[in-house]
Every structure is written in C-alpha cells, then in structure tokens.
C-alpha cells in the first residue's frame, strides 16, 4: 500500500482505527518501490499490473493455486506486535548459569564489539569479500583472526573460519585423507573428544568410505590410521602431554589433528610446538554468545605443507596497482566455485561475522588480557577442585584448565537437584559423575554457589572462597612441562587498541573502508542481498536467546523450541514440502544433508547402490562438491543454447544410469535466471528411472508464494535463510541452510543422538555440532515472516521479479541479456553478456566490476554461470531510485567502453583499466592519465554529494598467490 500524506488524511472523513493501523505495515518498509514506482516500472515493461507480469513470467503449470498456508501467521504483524510475540516466546526460556562445557562456554561480549560489530549494519550487511578493493576492513579483521589462531595454536597458517568445531574436525579428517597415508582408510578418534564432534565425523566418514575407530588416545599409534584426532584439554577436563604419542603416530605414518581450546592455549604449550599437523576448534568463548548452539566461528590451522589443501576461505596479503599492501581472498582455486567436485570442501558461507567478533575480542584484550582471563578461569577451577575435595568428593582429573569431572557416586541426582534449585546446569557425565566447566563469567559468588551445591549433597558446609584462595598458593593444575613459554599476539594490532576510545575508532576505520548494504545496493546474482531489517535483528542479542547452552535441559528451552517449530511450519508452507530440519548451519550443509537423506532413502529400499547424481552444466559449484562428499558420482547434463536443461541429454543420461540413478540436482529458477518451462518434465524423467529430485533453494526468493518445489516435483531442497529469509550475509557468514523434504523422506532428517536429540525415526547422523545449528539467528527469519504475512511475502517475490525485469529492460539496449524466457522476460535476476565488449574493446568483465566501485556500487556476480558475464539480482528491497542509479552507472560505463571502441579513449589508458581510483591517486601531485581526475572519481553528478572511496587500488591476485602471506602486515609496509 502506498503511504499517503498526513494532510490528505486529515482533510477527509475520519478513518477507522483498522484503516489507520495499516499505515504501520512492515511490508512498506521492506519492499523498496512504492505503488507509483511499481506502476512506472510496469509501464516500462508494458504490463498493466504486477499480476499480469507474473502470469507472463512463471509457467501456469507450476503456479501455486492457494495463498501461502501460514496459519496464525497469515496476517502480518506490525514490528511492535511481532517483537512482543517473540518476546513472549523468549520469556518461556530459562537462562540458567550453565557449566555444562562440552565446547560451549558463557562469555562477556565487550559492549564496544556488541554495539559496533554485531549490531552494526556496516559489518553484518556486507557480502563475502570477493571484491577485495571494497572489502579491506573486514579482510583486515579476518586477517587478524588468522593471525590470532596461528599464534595461539603455534601453527603456520589458519583459514578465515569454518562453520563449527565438529565440521572443522570433519574437514581436517578429509584433508588428511587427501594428503596422508595412502594405504589406510582409518581415522582414529580419541575417546575424550567432544561427543558431538565424533558424531559429525561419523556422518561425514560413512559415504566416502572412511572407517572411524575410537579408543584411548594412548592406543592411537597402533591403529594404522592416516589421521588421529586428540582433544586438548579433553572433554572431561584432562590436560595430557601428547608429545611422545605424536612422535609415535608420525613414526607410524599418520598425522595428528588436535581440537584445542584457544583460551587454554594462552597458558598451555600450543599443539604446533609438540608436533600437531592440524589444529581445529571453536572461538565461541572469545566474546560470542552461546546462542543455543550458534552461530560461532570455528578455526582450522595447519603446518605449512598443508596450506594449499585447506578448506574454507583464506585471507592473504598482496599489493595493489600502486604497489601498496592490499588484502584479498587467496588460493581461491581450492574452492567449490572453481574446482566443483574436486574442491577441498563444499563450504561456501562460513562464519565471517563471528570470526570478526572473536578477532576483535583478542584485539581488545590483547595477549596480557587474554592470559589474565585464562589464569582467572583456571584459578576458579582449582579452587572448586580444592573445595569439593574438602567436602569428600574426588575429582577424576588431577590436571585441568577449566573443567572438572567429579565422582559424586550415589549423590549424583542430589547434586543436580540442588544445582537446579540455584538455577545452575552441570554436565551429566554418568549416573555417578558430574562435570563442571567454569568460564570468564564465573564470579566469586558463582563459585560459592557451586561449592554450596556440593556441600548440600554431602550434608556439610561449603568452604569459604577466600579461605580456599589463601590456602591454595602455588598449587598448579597444569601438567609439568606443558605451561606455555612462547610469545603470542605480538603484532601491534593486538597491543594498541585496549582503551574503548582506541577500539571504537579502530572498528570505525575498518568499517569505513567497506561497501555494504548500508551504503548502496549489492546486486549480486544468486545471492539475494535484501534488507536485513533492524527489528528482525534486535532479538538476536536478547539474553533469553543468546545465553542458552545448546545442551541445556529441554524444560529451559521451551520458548526456543516453540519458535523453531513455528519457523519450520512457516518454511513447510513456503516450500510445499512436508518437513524441515533447521540443523544445517549453511546452505552447503543443507545441500549435503539432502543428498545423505536421498541415499538413506534408497538404502532403506534395498537400493543403496544408487550413487549417480545428475547435475546440469550450469550448476553452482557447491552442487558437485556436495555430491562428491556424499559419495556420489557426478554425471553432467548438458544445457541448451537458452541455458535450459537439455531434455534429450537428460533422457539419455537417465536411461544410461537408470539402475544406479540416485538423484538430479537442479536449481529453480535456473542459474540462468529463467523459469524453465519444462521443470515438471525434468522431475518426471528422473522419477521414472528411480531417482529423487533435489531442487537447490538458492533462488527461492523468486518462488515464495508463487510456486513451490514440493508441488512441482521436488523431493528435497535446502533453503538459504541468509538469502530469501533475511538473515544477513555478515561479510561471509553466518548462514542457515535448512533442509526441507517430502513426506516419504521425513524420517531421514538429521538427528544428534549423542546429545539426546533424535527427531527422525531413521534419521541420518548429525551434520552440525548443535541440534538446531545456528539457533540464535533463527528469530530473524521468524520476525520477517511474521511481519510480512502471506500476501506480503508473495508481493515481495513479485516485486523482486519486477525489479529484475526493469533492470533487464533498461539495460538491454546497452548490454545483451543472455538468457530470457517467453516474451524476453527473466525471473528475479538477469545475466548481462559482456563478451562482445571484450572482443571489440579489450575491456573485461573484471574491468567493469572494478569501475563500478568508482560509481559507488558492488559489482554483480562475475562470470557465473557463464564466463564473461554479470548476473544482476536487485531483490525487492531496492527502490526505483536506487535501481535507476545503478542503471545510470552501467549506461555511463557502457559509454566509456564505447569511447574505447571508437578510438576516443586509449585501450590501455582509460578509466576502466585503471579502476578503482583511490583518493590518494586522484589527489596526487602527478596525474599520468589521458582522462581527467574528475572522470576518474566523479563520472556522474550524484557522486558529488555521496562519494565512496575505495581504500586500495586494484589488487594483484596473481602476486598474492605466488607470494602467499596470510598473517598481519607490519606497519612499515604501509609507509
């Protein structure tokens, strides 16, 4: 509905309260173009209404007949109403003091980081830094993360984050399989590794033929394993000296992975110093709330020899066109978008925002501050150990950092009962033992309460904390010889921003370098960079969501589970499937889970031999990478000249592999930005040969309310809540990748048996460390759907399609639109073909992308799915004014190219070849170019009042990969 001017409302007969309330509709905030703008764009396209456009774009055979069946959420709520409804759910959660440990710990998020990173759209609305020149701020923050991890682990190089500790362990396993002992398929897991980690490892190992063995760490060298996973400290708190064991494993031809607690490594000898080949772990306790399991940034660090086999993203240092230091994503040829099924991993989205928070926690506290925190945590654990021993209890582990396992015998139930009365959670190790993991937030009063719990169970009086402290001088809880002596975090960045003033300014200086949605549209095709509304983001930092341990008792998480159930029902309605799991914490993991579900279904029918996965040539790189991880053989299906699946080739491949056909993976609308007319036929062909249909949900933003994969033949899909359902991209994560399935596949959805979470009868194993994955950001999608309601969600989809077609129509005279459906229409994105321009002018798609930075825009998706093209997706959130600004920039760039084609500009010395132009270059004393400074920096008038300056010139990618350097840069290099 178009907002009316208040004066007009005042001059009419008074409106009803209901009519006035519609003027606070959230949809009017979320959808960019108002009614007048939409009609103007429709007029440009030659349609009388949005409905007429949609009828022409989407095949009638797959149109949804009914309104989205959202039940109680069909009618939109105002922002205030939705927040109140979610607050009521949050209040059903009980925030206990959780000393469960098991990889998750309460922590203090420094307020300066909470407000200026987690709650700051300059950080959370940015995209993955594939365009380095406009991403230098978050690249520096991620480089800090890598330096922090490398220093603390004592290893050569770290990646820029993975999804969670369990996933990182599984990635380490497959890394060592690729590089290690050729005659072994055994991966050995010590029996004191986190149970959720072991379960994810088992899930990942099964389809690729790895045998997982478990047992005492001491037996690892005799296991004939290509790799061994050790926990340091162990889940029960033990800190063991693994130096001799590591030497023995190496002598036997194996490699060693260590799951290490980074805070503990400030006081313990790092694994890199005693022979570990790989270190993995979670950085959650560095200032990131527990959030019922996530999101958190995992890490993976390796010895130098493994750096080119690392999974995930890697930030490296290079130089720009002026020879100044610049940062970029390094060694991208390892990744799925390039190597497809041969990639080191299928991970696309990681946990950039959380990695940035963890790195800034280290920057803010510095090495001395971190060590002080660690020593205090260790001291509290030591006092607790002394106290429970005075009360007559024995500790299982004599060495520890922060975790005690306590023999409580027949009094175990009493201990838990008394703890519950004080709103305390302890780990239920067994019927005779409890675990206690203290943390940064544990106070003297908390310690007194813990001692009182054990005193009540023992029928005694708790010793006083001060008396314990006075009597425990000089007692060491760390093994002799394992105290850390090496320096860490010596780089200046970790030693200068310890006042809040300095930290605030440092964060501001970094965010000012970057281009995010808070500055301009980001028209990345297949990425759906839509509004992340502030009201959607607010609940993420509520303690009732952030302060919950993922393994807290069910009665403490009633509100969470109710919200999750409602969100699952919303997604079922949107997709047309029967059931959804929210456990996968990225689209890549939802995709992987979907393929495992298909395999489990075939196996349950005695057809476990079905292992062929058909994938169109145009598919996103995660598709073949995930299929390979799921143990499937990839067979490529050709696409025709229009970009559609070649039906004849599909029939031939399906017939050829009929006996072994497991699935086809298709994207809808297609990766070419078109609603293929024959999608039902594609599904029917595969079903006829016994296969299942996997519909990639990356483009769900073009389907919500209009069509549904579960209704036109899909059996399983993953969704990207960080695309369609408004979770922000965070500069490269977090994401959520739910897997949605038909009724016949529902019983195979992911479980997590190690923690008692089992929702599916024959469910596959866990694919994430926590039962509900990145649970604390699920309220974002819940809020979006609740505030939009059924009709407005459909209107958003229609507007996304309208915006894309408007751009395609306006730019078609200047750049050919490569693929379109009937009537020359596209779906929610369009592909602009720049290949003819390259032939006539020498200007590349990369040149255009860099030149767009001078105009204040992030480039569209480059060279996907077709090399030499730009894929543009504007989303429904961008206004016509912003679309016109982008169109004007693209037309102006085309005229600059035309000047090269006609000889009016030099083929080498022109504003495209030297883009982007920094302020330092434009204001330098010397100007060596034939074109003017004004043309370089202010090519259109609108930039005069709103200019973004790229902080570096064009990054030299080849130099960065040839001279790989992935640590913080000395200040002298910036001189």
UniProtKB/Swiss-Prot annotation:
Its cofactor is pyridoxal 5'-phosphate. The modification N6-(pyridoxal phosphate)lysine is found at residue 723. One of its GO terms (biological process) is glycine decarboxylation via glycine cleavage system. It catalyses: N(6)-[(R)-lipoyl]-L-lysyl-[glycine-cleavage complex H protein] + glycine + H(+) = N(6)-[(R)-S(8)-aminomethyldihydrolipoyl]-L-lysyl-[glycine-cleavage complex H protein] + CO2. InterPro entries: GcvP, GDC-P_C, GDC-P_N, GDC_P, PyrdxlP-dep_Trfase, PyrdxlP-dep_Trfase_major, PyrdxlP-dep_Trfase_small. Keywords: Oxidoreductase, Pyridoxal phosphate. Its EC number is 1.4.4.2. Disulfide bonds: none annotated. GO terms for cellular component: cytosol; glycine cleavage complex. It is an enzyme of class 1 (oxidoreductase). Gene3D superfamilies: Aspartate Aminotransferase, domain 1 (3.90.1150.10), Type I PLP-dependent aspartate aminotransferase-like (Major domain) (3.40.640.10). It comes from the Bacteria. Pfam families: GcvP2_C, GDC-P. The glycine cleavage system is composed of four proteins: P, T, L and H. HAMAP family: GcvP. Belongs to the GcvP family. The glycine cleavage system catalyzes the degradation of glycine. The P protein binds the alpha-amino group of glycine through its pyridoxal phosphate cofactor; CO(2) is released and the remaining methylamine moiety is then transferred to the lipoamide cofactor of the H protein. This is Glycine dehydrogenase (decarboxylating). The lineage of its organism: Bacteria, Pseudomonadati, Pseudomonadota, Betaproteobacteria, Burkholderiales.
């Amino acid at each position: 509905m178009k907002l009316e001017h208040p004066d007009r409302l005042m001059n009419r007969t008074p409106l009803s309260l209901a009519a006035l309330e519609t003027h606070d509709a959230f949809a009017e905030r979320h959808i960019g173009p108002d009614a007048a703008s939409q009609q103007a764009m429709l007029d440009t396209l030659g349609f009388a209404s949005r409905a007429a456009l949609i009828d022409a774009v989407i095949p009638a055979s797959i149109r949804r007949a009914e309104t989205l069946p959202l039940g109680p959420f069909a009618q939109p709520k105002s922002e205030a109403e939705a927040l109140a409804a979610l607050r009521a759910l949050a209040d059903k959660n009980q925030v206990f003091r959780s000393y469960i440990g098991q990889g998750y710990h309460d922590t203090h998020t420094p307020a300066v980081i909470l407000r200026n990173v987690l709650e700051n759209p300059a950080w959370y609305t940015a995209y993955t830094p594939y365009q380095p020149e406009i991403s230098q701020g978050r690249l520096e923050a991620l480089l800090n993360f890598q330096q922090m991890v490398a220093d603390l682990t004592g290893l050569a190089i770290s990646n820029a984050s993975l999804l969670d500790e369990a996933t990182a362990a599984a990635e380490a396993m497959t890394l060592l399989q690729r590089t290690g002992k050729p005659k072994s398929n055994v991966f050995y897991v010590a029996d004191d590794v986190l149970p959720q980690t072991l379960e994810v490892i088992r899930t990942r190992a099964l389809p690729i033929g790895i045998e997982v063995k478990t047992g005492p760490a001491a037996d690892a060298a005799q296991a004939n394993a290509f790799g061994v996973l050790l926990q340091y400290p162990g889940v029960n708190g033990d800190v063991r000296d693994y130096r001799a064991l590591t030497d023995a494993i190496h002598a036997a031809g194996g490699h060693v992975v260590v799951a290490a607690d980074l805070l503990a490594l400030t006081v313990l000898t790092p694994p890199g110093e005693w022979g570990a080949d790989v270190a993995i772990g979670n950085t959650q306790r560095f200032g990131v709330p527990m959030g019922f399991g996530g999101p958190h940034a995992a890490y993976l660090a390796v010895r130098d020899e493994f750096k080119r086999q690392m999974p995930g993203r890697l930030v490296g240092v290079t130089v720009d066109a002026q020879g100044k230091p610049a940062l970029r994503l390094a060694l991208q040829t390892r990744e799925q978008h390039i190597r497809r099924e041969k990639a080191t991993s299928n991970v696309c989205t990681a946990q950039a925002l959380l990695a940035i928070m963890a790195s800034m926690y280290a920057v803010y506290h510095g090495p001395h501050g971190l060590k002080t925190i660690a020593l205090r945590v260790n001291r509290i654990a030591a006092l607790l150990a002394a106290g429970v021993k005075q009360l007559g209890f024995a500790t299982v582990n004599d060495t520890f950092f922060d975790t005690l396992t306590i023999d409580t015998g027949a009094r175990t139930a009493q201990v838990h009962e008394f703890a519950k009365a004080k709103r305390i959670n302890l780990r239920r190790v067994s019927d005779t033992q409890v675990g206690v993991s203290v943390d940064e937030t544990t106070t003297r009063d908390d310690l007194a309460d813990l001692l009182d719990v054990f005193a009540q169970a023992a029928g005694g009086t708790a010793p006083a904390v001060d008396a314990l402290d006075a009597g425990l001088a000089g007692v060491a809880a760390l093994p002799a010889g394992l105290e850390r002596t090496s320096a860490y975090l010596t780089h200046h960045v970790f030693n200068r921003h310890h006042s809040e003033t300095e930290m605030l300014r440092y964060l501001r200086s970094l965010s000012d370098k970057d281009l995010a949605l808070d500055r301009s549209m980001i028209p990345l095709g297949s990425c759906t960079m839509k509004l992340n509304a502030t009201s959607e983001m607010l609940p993420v930092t509520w303690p009732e969501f952030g302060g919950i341990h993922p393994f807290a008792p069910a009665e403490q998480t009633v509100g969470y589970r109710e919200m999750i159930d409602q969100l699952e029902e919303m997604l079922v309605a949107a997709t047309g499937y029967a059931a959804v799991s929210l456990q996968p914490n990225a689209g890549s993991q939802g995709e992987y889970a979907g393929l495992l579900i298909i395999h489990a279904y075939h196996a349950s029918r005695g057809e476990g031999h079905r292992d062929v996965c058909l994938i169109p040539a145009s598919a996103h790189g995660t598709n073949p990478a995930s299929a390979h991880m799921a143990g499937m053989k990839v067979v490529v299906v050709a696409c025709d000249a229009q970009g559609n699946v070649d039906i004849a080739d599909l029939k031939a491949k399906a017939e050829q592999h009929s006996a072994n056909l497991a699935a086809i993976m298709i994207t809808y609308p297609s990766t070419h930005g078109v609603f293929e007319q024959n999608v039902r036929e594609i599904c029917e062909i595969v079903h006829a040969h016994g296969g299942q249909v996997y519909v990639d949900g990356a483009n769900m933003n073009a389907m919500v309310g209009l069509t549904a994969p579960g209704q036109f033949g899909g059996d399983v899909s993953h969704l990207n809540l960080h695309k369609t359902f408004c979770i922000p991209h965070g500069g490269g994560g977090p994401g959520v990748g739910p897997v949605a399935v038909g009724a016949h596949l529902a019983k195979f959805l992911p479980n997590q048996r190690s923690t008692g979470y089992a929702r599916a009868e024959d469910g596959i194993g866990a694919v994430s460390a926590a039962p509900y994955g990145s649970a604390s950001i699920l309220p974002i999608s819940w809020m979006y759907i609740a505030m939009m309601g059924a009709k407005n969600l459909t209107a958003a989809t229609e507007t996304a399609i309208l915006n894309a077609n408007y751009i395609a129509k306006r730019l078609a005279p200047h750049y050919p639109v490569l693929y379109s459906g009937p009537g020359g229409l596209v779906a929610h994105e369009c592909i602009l073909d720049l290949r003819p321009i390259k032939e006539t002018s020498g200007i590349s798609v990369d040149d255009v992308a860099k030149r767009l930075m001078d105009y204040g825009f992030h480039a569209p998706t480059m060279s996907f799915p077709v090399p030499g093209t730009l894929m543009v997706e504007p989303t429904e959130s961008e206004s016509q004014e912003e679309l016109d600004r982008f169109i004007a920039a693209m037309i102006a760039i085309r005229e600059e190219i035309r000047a090269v084609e006609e000889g009016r500009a030099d083929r080498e010395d022109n504003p495209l070849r030297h883009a982007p132009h920094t302020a330092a270059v434009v204001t330098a004393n010397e100007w060596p170019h034939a074109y003017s400074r004004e043309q370089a920096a202010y090519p259109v008038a609108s930039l005069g009042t709103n200019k973004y300056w790229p902080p570096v010139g064009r990054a030299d990618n080849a130099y960065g990969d040839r001279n790989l350097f992935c640590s913080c840069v000395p200040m002298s290099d910036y001189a």
